Amino acid sequence: MKIIEEIPQKNIIKLMPENLDDLWVLYNIIEEGDKIFAVTERRVQDKGDVIRADRGAKRKMFLGIEVKNVEFDENTKRVRILGTIIHGPDDVPLGSHHTIEIKPFDELSIEKNWKKWQIERIKEAIESSKRPKVLVVVMDDEEADIFEVRDYSIKEICSIKSHTSKKLDYKINEELKKEYYHEIAKVLSEYDVDNILVAGPGFAKNSFYNFISSQYPELKNKIVVESISTTSRAGLNEVIKRGIINRIYAESRVAKETQLIEKLLEEIAKKGLAVYGIDEVKKALEYSAIDTLLVSDSLVRNHEIEKIIDTTEEMGGKVVIVSSEHDAGKQLKALGGIAGLLRFPIE
């Protein structure tokens, strides 16, 4: 996510989403009554079109709408913002209905009464865009190429050689192999990422993973191992074409949310540090007991929920918006769509 411009005196922020996660942020922060300004397409009839019963030609124009509804389509990578026109060219009637579609790299201006948690979601999206999406290690017994993959760029970090050889003694080769693995692991340890893909032909990738498991346990849970047919840049291209990176990244986000819901259910089962449902969450807030508030994305536009989110953040609690598209999100929805992990037990 990028902030293009801010006009604080008018409560306007101009944004450019860069990926699917940014669109999901927009979907969650745009609400009924907000004003959206963007370049969009609309059919416009001239007098001749009316006489011929022609629907008119589509034309690009800059429009402003007052939001009535927002939809998120993950498959087409679009946020659809439905509303009534409040600003536009003279030949476009004010008050008529229009839908603005936003996809990655489209710019839009949002005018609204901004809530603290909405600003925080934007800041988190901006920080996320600065971090690598995933590190990719394409390797075999002889060489490892390490890449930093972002949503819109790929950077080669380094290439590391093993210096092993069939001409060398077995023990020497084993020592060289350990040094090779250590060197790769040290590079990976320098990066703040949640996902590391280790890919390659043969058994080197599995041997490296076993080495990581024993020598660098802090990296173990970040690593996913995949088989590919070749190494170097061609191997990276194979990884991208097969959609492996996108799958890992999507699974990672779902996994984080699933872990939180599992922890919630465990605490509920033992009547421990958890509450669920609006009434119980409100009660916990009265004691400043909520450490992490879990909210279904289906409820973020509910005014009562918004107040709970605001209060939680004012008290130093963390707020996690959980997607209702996966099983754990559906479990949260079944619990009333809102729950809290507590700092301490309450009566």
UniProtKB/Swiss-Prot annotation:
GO terms for cellular component: cytosol; translation release factor complex. Keywords: Cytoplasm, Endonuclease, Hydrolase, Metal-binding, Nuclease. Its EC number is 3.1.-.-. GO terms for molecular function: endonuclease activity; metal ion binding; sequence-specific mRNA binding; translation release factor activity, codon specific. The N-terminal domain has the RNA-binding Sm fold. It harbors the endoribonuclease activity. Monomer. PANTHER family: PELOTA, PROTEIN PELOTA HOMOLOG. This is Protein pelota homolog. It comes from Methanocaldococcus jannaschii (strain ATCC 43067 / DSM 2661 / JAL-1 / JCM 10045 / NBRC 100440) (Methanococcus jannaschii).
